[in-house]
From Swiss-Prot:
Regulatory component of the inositol phosphorylceramide (ICP) synthase which catalyzes the addition of a phosphorylinositol group onto ceramide to form inositol phosphorylceramide, an essential step in sphingolipid biosynthesis. Helps the medial Golgi localization of IPC synthase in a COPI vesicle-dependent manner. GO terms for cellular component: Golgi apparatus; Golgi membrane; inositol phosphoceramide synthase complex. Keywords: Golgi apparatus, Lipid metabolism, Membrane, Sphingolipid metabolism, Transmembrane, Transmembrane helix. This is Inositol phosphorylceramide synthase regulatory subunit kei1. The keyword Lipid metabolism applies.
Length: 236
């Protein structure tokens, strides 16, 4: 008898990351629709950012990149808002990839702007203490980061980052549900443009995310064969 069992990574991934509903009472499809409209409202601010670039020439390259990416994401989310209610597997996968990229970009921009803001606090505080030679050394960036005034801002950043990560899991779970329910297999897709796009979208999803739909599809297929066999036996 083996002392150690090889962990079932696919089942563990499904148990931790695959959600059954949105907030415990809404379906995944309704959750994805809500997520898309929240994203559209959020990305509208990118339009105002583009306008502000023409009025302010002091914008950093990161700000320009953030505003441009917001406009591109606004276009993509507006397009996906039309197709997600139709329960389309390719569009559900596109939503997952787009929202994941948007989440990673938001984390990157948040970290960059937070570091820039706190570094300016350090510089302003150190310049105010330069007049006194015997004064204590200026506080470090880590000290200002965890000051009482900064803790609420830090908690808000963590809350919204956690909420967006949960939204990423919802989009992943919705695409997983559509794949499982439809029983789509990459090798069975048609050779047309739509089939090639769907196969391309499913390839990284299968490799890196979850292969449980293959197991579920096989189990469902086996159960249907057993049911047909029992019915045939009863008829005979």
């Amino acid at each position: 008898m083996a002392l150690f069992r090889r962990p079932n990574w696919s089942a563990l991934f499904e148990k931790i990351f695959i959600q059954k509903s949105f907030l415990g009472f809404c379906s995944l499809r309704v959750g994805c629709e809500i997520i898309i409209w929240f994203a559209i409202i959020n990305k509208v601010s990118g339009l105002y950012g583009i306008v502000s670039l023409f009025q302010n020439s002091d914008a950093s390259p990161w700000q320009v990149l953030m505003y441009v990416s917001s406009v591109l994401m606004l276009i993509l989310f507006s397009w996906l808002a039309i197709h997600i209610p139709k329960s389309s597997v390719p569009h559900a996968l596109i939503l997952f990839y787009v929202y994941l990229i948007d989440f990673l970009l938001n984390v990157l921009f948040t970290v960059l702007f937070a570091l820039s803001w706190f570094s300016k606090l350090v510089q302003s505080d150190s310049s105010s203490t330069e007049e006194s030679a015997d004064s204590d050394p200026s506080p470090s960036l880590l000290y200002l980061f965890f000051q009482a005034e900064s803790i609420p801002s830090l908690l808000l950043l963590i809350f919204f980052a956690s909420l967006k990560f949960y939204f990423v899991l919802i989009t992943l779970s919705y695409s997983n549900k559509l794949i499982v329910d439809s029983g789509i297999r990459p090798q069975n897709l048609p050779p047309n443009f739509s089939g090639r796009v769907t196969r391309l979208l499913m390839k990284p999803y299968i490799m890196a995310a979850n292969r449980s739909y293959l197991r579920n599809h096989t189990k469902r297929f086996t159960d249907s064969i057993e049911l047909e066999q029992r019915l045939m036996d009863e008829v005979v």
